[in-house]
Amino acid sequence: MKRTMFSLTLLLILSVALSGCSIVGSRISHALGDEENYIMNEEIITEKVESIDIDWRVGKVAITPWNGEDIVVKEKSDTTLTSRTKMRVRNQDGNLTVEDTAKGVWLLPLLFKKDLEVMVPVGVDLRIVDVKATSSSVYISELSVMDVNIESTSGDIVLDEMKVVGNTSLKSASGKIDADMKAGVTFKAETASGSINTSVSESLTSLDAKSASGSLSIAVKDTERI
């Protein structure tokens, strides 16, 4: 009897949560009135940006250089994007924040994932890059940054040809960490389940790498202090 009541309750919750949703094949998408639907969403930042703060739920996160003049923020999804599920982007006092709004909607993050790409003009020096990801792999390449802080609950972290003048902190609860970079002051990498492979400059004053279940590979480059 208790099992029957639990099943009925679960079905009722799901029916309420999915009301107002359209089902196409095996995909579910929210439709809000006559709102235009998107698969790709893009924001162009023309003002000066000194730091980037990303909070993402599910999908890949990439920060890469490009030859344009402005920072471009793009999200991609194989499921319809609406005002409830599109990212929230704001640039205030040089601090660019990108938030995955779907993370605040119950059940919605379980239905689809979105990939995020932030394209930074070549030659732009950033003060801070801070990324918090839940079920996302994070990839950052060829950027010059003062400090980097990346934290992922479940996903790989990859830094490729990075120049970090100050402090680097990389943490993944479940995922590998690969870092090829010039690091200025401190470097810290930690993963509970996954390998750590890093190549850093010898100018570091502190290096800390920990893996509860995985291999460690640390190479020190013979480079001048940044």
Task: Describe each region flagged by the PLM.
Residues 5-8, 20-56, 60-133, 139-151, ...:
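Acidic (Asp/Glu) and glycine-rich low-complexity loops/linkers
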